[in-house]
């Protein structure tokens, strides 16, 4: 919707920030723009946790062709945002079947059936709403959305949940154990998913 572009232009006027209208003719993609701006043999750095694998692969291909070094583990904003609000520490809560319409075991069975159709042995889920639906719990990590920061890896015989352990109450732990869900520290996903 072009109204967002119009509003952005108005609000950014005089800021020194240039609006790049995504998916509009003559506007380069992020990768193309970086390739145009970074010189041969240069370097780009960012927090790789905010990119999809496909974007990362595209960066490697396009920027690598210009011998541009890519640093994926640099979170500059975190380094300079001194009064950054901390993440919510409120515990999440389990939703009973009467509210969700389906128990965790049934949902996992259906996911595994789909995995088998595709010949997949591992399914990584990074979408917070998908994880909340799959495991029937909700939380308070995202303002205005009842979601919890987590990752889920579904395998044939087990599930790995990556979450801040302090968010889990006894009821959720019981339900996760019943469904063979192994609980891991949130940040372990970055090594385990490699």
PLM region spans:
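A composition/biophysics-driven feature that prefers long, compositionally simple stretches
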Residues: 1-194
């Amino acid at each position: 919707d072009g109204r967002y572009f119009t509003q952005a232009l108005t609000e950014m006027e005089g800021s020194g920030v240039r609006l790049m209208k995504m998916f509009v003719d003559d506007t380069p993609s992020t990768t193309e723009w970086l390739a145009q701006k970074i010189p041969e043999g240069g370097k780009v750095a960012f927090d790789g946790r905010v990119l999809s694998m496909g974007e990362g692969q595209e960066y490697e291909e396009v920027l690598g062709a210009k011998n541009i070094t890519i640093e994926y583990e640099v979170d500059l904003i975190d380094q300079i945002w001194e009064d950054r609000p901390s993440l919510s520490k409120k515990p999440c809560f389990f939703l009973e079947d009467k509210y969700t319409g389906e128990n965790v075991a049934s949902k996992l069975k259906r996911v595994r059936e789909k995995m088998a159709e595709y010949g997949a042995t591992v399914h990584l889920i990074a979408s917070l709403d998908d994880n909340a639906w799959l495991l029937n719990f909700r939380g308070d990590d995202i303002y205005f959305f009842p979601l919890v920061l987590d990752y889920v890896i579904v395998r044939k015989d087990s599930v790995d949940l990556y979450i801040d352990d302090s968010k889990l109450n006894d009821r959720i732990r019981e339900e996760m154990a019943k469904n063979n869900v192994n609980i891991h520290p949130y940040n372990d996903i970055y090594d385990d998913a490699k």
